[in-house]
Amino acid sequence: SRKNRGKQFSVLFSISSLLSIIAPVLAGFLMAKWGFSLVTVVAMIISIASMVPFLFLPKTKETLAWTYGETFRYFFHPFNRRMVGAYMADGAVGIVNGVFWPLFLFFLLDGKYNAMGMITGAILLAGLVIRLIVGNFLDKFEKLKLVRIGTILNSSAWLIKTIVVSALHVFLASLYHTIAIIVLRTSLDTLVYEKAADRGHYIDEYTLIKEMSIHFGKILILVLIAGMLFFFPLQVTFIIAAVFTLFVNLLK
C-alpha cells in the first residue's frame, strides 16, 4: 500500500540482504585458506543455481509500444531529460560503490581477506537492522524531500571516505554511508514505484528508459575514471561519486 510502501520496500531489501551478510565473511575465509580459485568456482555454482527457478516461470510475451527509434527519441527528448540525468547519475555512483570502493579496501587492508569479509559482513548486518527500523519511519515523510536529504547524506559520505586510512575508519564511514543509502534508496525506489503506478501506462517503456539511463551512466563514469586515474589517486573516484550523487536530485 502507498501508506506503508517504505516499510514494505525495507522488508524486501532486508530479506534479499540476508545471504549478502554471510557471503563476504565466508568468501574472506575461503580466500584466506584456499585463494581465489575456490571462491570463483563457488560463485559460478551459485550463479548457475540461481538461474534454475527461471526455467519454471510461465512464458509471457510482452510487446513495447515504442520501436527502437522511438525509444531513443524519447530517451533524448527534453521532457525526459531530468529523469535520464538522475538515473545516469545513479548508475555512475553504483559503479564507484561496486567496483572502486572494494578495490580501495583491498589495497588499504593489504589483502587481509578475513578482515575484509568480517568488516563487510558487520556493515551489512548493521544496515539490515537499520533498514528495518528506518523503513517504517520513512513512511511518515514526503518521499521527494527524503530523496533530497538522502543525496546530501550520500554525497557527504563519499567525501568522508576520501580520508579513510584504517579498518576502524572503514567501518565507521561505511556505517554512516549505509544509513545514507537506506534513506536515499528506500525513498527513491518507493518514489519511482509510485510514479510508475500513478502513470498507469507506458510502464515498461519508461522502465526501459530508466535502465538505459543507468547503463549509460555506468559507461560515462568508467570512461571518465579511466582517464583520471592516470593522474590522480583512487580516492578521486569518491569525489566524483559525491558530485554525481547530487544529480539524483534532478528526479521530480
Label each residue range with its predicted role.
Residues 41-45, 145-160:
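Structural signature of the two symmetry-related core transmembrane helices
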Residues 44-63, 251:
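C-terminal membrane-cytosol helix-exit motif in multi-pass small-molecule transporters
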Residues 31, 129-143, 229:
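Helix-to-loop junctions at the C-terminal end of transmembrane segments
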